[in-house]
């Protein structure tokens, strides 16, 4: 039995055909008209709360608008626009066979303060926001990511299709060595649970699986102790794959299938979309002392649901990855969350 019961979406993509509804609550004026520096300076504005209001309102929207971001003509090509296109080639190690460290720097290239963003696609999907935040806060962001290769080492790691994946272990060790030699101020890390071979741990209990994944996470954190960096772990994102096998409306294709009842797709309860295993493994109580959790899930879900679209913008590019446009749009709220943790 495989731990991750879904294909790696950036390699075997179920392309999202998403459309969007007009919401009665908008943060567009905030996110589109103000510069990142203005976002940091104007601390009286609660961008996270504004975004939460928009996410909540989206659950009750019904009809599709004419204009969407990105445009409908690009829906079948969202995978090629994943992350920042200008740096994708040098930053994103997609091929299974590659195990080299990407040469990727975002944010403020000449800054004296450096952080590392490490992990799999769950880390890379936030690069548009980290890039804007780094530029505004004079922080260099070194990105060390590989598709389908979570940052935490696991002796039974396999590829999403169940095949052997030795390149992931090589990449993981190279990332650790790079971090320990770089001595960044912070390491921000994100990733899914390791993919296990078919049949492995088939009779394991949920508690046993959690114990194994938690041990993997702690092993990674321990391995970069020599860097003396502070460590921040990004909260697990919502995962529509958790219901894909039993619920026909959880795939983002739901939106194009229900043009006059988008609320059917936008109102899935948060409790049904949480990656419970990773959420438990990445809670403050389960992590070593001093490690902080970055609640970026607040940029994707309200307290009760996780809409696929908000206003005229796609939230997700597939079942569990943030669209590039949404990651750019929520920079004000992203900045508020990250700066509150003193990562800057």
Per-region residue spans from a language model:
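Extracellular/periplasmic envelope-modification machinery, especially enzymes
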Residues: 2-344
């Amino acid at each position: 039995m495989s731990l991750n019961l879904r294909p790696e979406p950036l390699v075997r993509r179920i392309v999202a055909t998403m459309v969007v509804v007009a919401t009665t609550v908008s943060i567009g004026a905030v996110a589109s008209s103000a510069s990142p520096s203005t976002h940091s300076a104007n601390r009286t504005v609660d961008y996270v709360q504004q975004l939460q209001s928009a996410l909540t309102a989206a659950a009750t929207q019904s009809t599709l608008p004419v204009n969407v971001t990105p445009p409908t003509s690009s829906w079948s090509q969202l995978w090629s626009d994943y992350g920042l296109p200008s740096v994708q080639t040098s930053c994103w190690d997609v091929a299974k066979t590659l195990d080299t460290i990407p040469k990727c720097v975002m944010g403020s290239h000449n800054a004296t303060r450096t952080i590392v963003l490490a992990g799999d696609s769950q880390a890379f999907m936030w690069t548009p926001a980290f890039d804007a935040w780094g530029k505004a806060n004079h922080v260099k962001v070194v990105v060390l990511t590989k598709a389908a290769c979570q940052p935490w080492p696991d002796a039974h790691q396999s590829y999403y299709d169940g095949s052997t994946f030795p390149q992931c272990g090589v990449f993981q060790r190279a990332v650790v060595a790079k971090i320990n030699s770089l001595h960044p101020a912070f390491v921000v890390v994100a990733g899914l649970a390791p993919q296990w071979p078919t049949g492995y741990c088939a009779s394991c209990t949920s508690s046993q699986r959690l114990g194994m994944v938690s041990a993997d996470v702690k092993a990674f954190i321990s391995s970069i102790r020599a860097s003396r960096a502070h460590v921040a772990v990004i909260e697990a994102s919502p995962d529509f794959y958790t219901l894909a096998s039993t619920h026909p409306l959880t795939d983002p294709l739901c939106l194009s299938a229900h043009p006059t009842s988008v609320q059917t797709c936008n109102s899935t309860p948060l409790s049904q979309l949480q990656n419970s295993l990773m959420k438990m493994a990445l809670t403050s109580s389960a992590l070593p002392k001093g490690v902080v959790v970055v609640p970026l899930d607040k940029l994707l879900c309200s307290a009760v649901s996780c809409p696929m679209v908000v206003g005229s913008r796609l939230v997700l590019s597939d079942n569990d990855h943030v669209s590039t446009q949404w990651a750019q749009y929520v920079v004000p709220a992203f900045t508020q969350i990250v700066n509150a943790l003193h990562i800057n």
